């Protein structure tokens, strides 16, 4: 039976995630209100503007029910702004910005600069594969990880060693990435995550 995956559809790149998920055989639901969380096997928090997503989640009374669902074990794939929304700490939070505080990391927003500084590359991601295509658009970076957080992806440093910025982590049922896997033709991130979701169903 195909898993039912919710995609938070308040703002940002949710349509691209839906397209990839459906191409891999998943059923999808756009999530805007707490009732949309019922019966989900997994949920995606897409990229976009983290401050806007935060305000809309609170305006639509989605933040607390979503927080509760994730704490109960609902599998999560968070990309770019979705990572920011989950973090316990932000180095450069906007005035009045809240997070769900579900992922024990510190994040610096827009760490790679403006939209003009966006770039594409490949990453080796533990549990996903080597040479995975990744698109970074005004991407955040993870500057601290808590003791229960596994680092699964880092950018290469100037010498080509994989010891640069942390751009992917896993903590229990949460997979969080700085980049946009949905903006590439490489579906391995979604495919791997869906396999894990299906195993939980």
Curated annotation (Swiss-Prot):
L-glutamine binds at residues 48-50, 109, 137-138. It catalyses: aldehydo-D-ribose 5-phosphate + D-glyceraldehyde 3-phosphate + L-glutamine = pyridoxal 5'-phosphate + L-glutamate + phosphate + 3 H2O + H(+); L-glutamine + H2O = L-glutamate + NH4(+). InterPro entries: Class_I_gatase-like, PdxT/SNO, PdxT/SNO_CS. Pfam families: SNO. Gene3D superfamilies: 3.40.50.880. Its EC number is 4.3.3.6, 3.5.1.2. One of its GO terms (cellular component) is glutaminase complex. The active site is at residues 80, 180, 182. Pathway: Cofactor biosynthesis; pyridoxal 5'-phosphate biosynthesis. Keywords: Glutamine amidotransferase, Hydrolase, Lyase, Pyridoxal phosphate. Belongs to the glutaminase PdxT/SNO family. HAMAP family: PdxT. Catalyzes the hydrolysis of glutamine to glutamate and ammonia as part of the biosynthesis of pyridoxal 5'-phosphate. The resulting ammonia molecule is channeled to the active site of PdxS. This is Pyridoxal 5'-phosphate synthase subunit PdxT. It comes from Cutibacterium acnes (strain DSM 16379 / KPA171202) (Propionibacterium acnes).
């Amino acid at each position: 039976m195909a898993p039912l995956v919710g995609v938070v559809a308040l703002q940002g790149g949710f349509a691209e995630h839906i397209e990839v998920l459906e191409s891999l055989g998943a059923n999808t639901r756009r999530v805007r209100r707490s009732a949309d969380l019922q019966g989900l096997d997994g949920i995606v928090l897409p990229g976009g503007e983290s401050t806007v997503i935060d305000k809309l989640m609170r305006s639509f009374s989605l933040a607390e029910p979503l927080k509760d669902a994730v704490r109960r074990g609902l599998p999560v794939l968070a990309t770019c702004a979705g990572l920011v929304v989950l973090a316990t700490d932000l180095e450069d939070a906007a005035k009045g910005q809240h997070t769900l505080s579900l992922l024990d990391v510190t994040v610096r927003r827009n760490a790679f600069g403006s939209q003009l500084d966006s770039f594409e590359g490949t990453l080796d991601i533990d549990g996903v594969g080597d040479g995975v295509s990744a698109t970074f658009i005004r991407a955040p970076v993870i500057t601290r990880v808590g003791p229960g957080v596994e680092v699964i992806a880092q950018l290469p440093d100037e010498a080509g060693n994989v010891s640069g910025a942390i751009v992917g982590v896993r903590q229990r049922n949460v997979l969080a990435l700085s980049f946009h896997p949905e903006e590439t033709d490489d579906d391995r991130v979604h495919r791997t995550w869906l396999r894990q979701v299906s195993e939980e169903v």
